[in-house]
Amino acid sequence: MSMHQEEKAVLKRARELEYPTDRLGPTGLMTQASHINSSRMIMLASQLGHMVSIKDPETPLIPTGFENKLAERAPMLYQSDADYEVVAKIAKNEYTYVIIGYDAKKRVYHAWKREEAEEHSEGFSTRYDNKFIDSLEIGDKIDTGEYVKKSTNFDKHMNYRYGKNINVVYLVAPFVYEDGILAMNGVEDMFNTFRSHTKRIKLADNEVLVNLYGDSDHYQGIPKIGEKTKKGIVCAIRKTDSASAPRSLKSDKLRQIERSDRICYGSGRVIDIEILTNKDPRKMPDTGANRMVKELYLQQQEYYRELYHYMNDIAERADDEGYTYTDEFSIIAAEARDYIDAATFFADTSDTVYGTTEIVIHLLDEEQMIVGSKFVG
């Protein structure tokens, strides 16, 4: 096979690869082969898949080239492909909202959804650096190449940061027996990670939320958005009936957890709440223990209704006015429609239509290193 034919064969295989990371993965970029033996390279390659994002990572003092190259292939980077002007900002809460931009030159609408973090397997998560998107207001410009949002693992030069620069020492001592590493003081506080947890709470018609987050003046069964859970408890649910109601629904009893209560455990700060129900909101409790659930549901529906109507109006006028919109714009509009479409019914994983109300609480927690955490240097 000639060199020309070999090049054609290589290019053909490259074009058949679906994702950019299929061509060159992090294990191929990370190591400097001339400075590491084969066993260590294999070990490091296997460990890369188990790395978790840490709080405030640092750029390595001795880079490999991997750190900057990865930015071209990272999935948690949202780079503007055109010059957009912000035409709308529709918010659900301080952690979740949608920015809509318009490129007058190409006549294209695009949308970005602001998210606090992305949840991975086993509850580990990566936070987004939302400084730029949080600064945007209607009328602001988004230039081509601007990173609208990105993982906090990247610095301002778009170098991927996956660890910390710490002082270690190699010596003969019981502390470093086998694979032990003797490191500087304070290391245990430098490698905090973030954990995301999604808690799903079913609430039947004969159940109420215990008043764990309220007081004698107001009733609050779950933490509000931005608040932290108390003592590792998200909420407690109490089943009521005509026989037990006179005692179990007294105000002082509703501020205490009883043995028969169903408890939802979880730690962290609430970054979003969803209320999933097929009930007519007019029939949802408007007073008492579950009033907050109805209020959250009405606020949620108003957000999705405003978002969908705005985006749908743009979509309906696209052909007549000669502009278009991106796939991401369509996806966000479709998600909003699912919440307000009267023909849509929420169902569980077995496709059983909800007969109850489900409260979905998204938590973000900061976790310290503990005994048993794997630390690689």
Regions found by a protein language model. Give the residues of each.
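Long, charge-dense accessory insertions within large macromolecular proteins
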Residues: 1-376
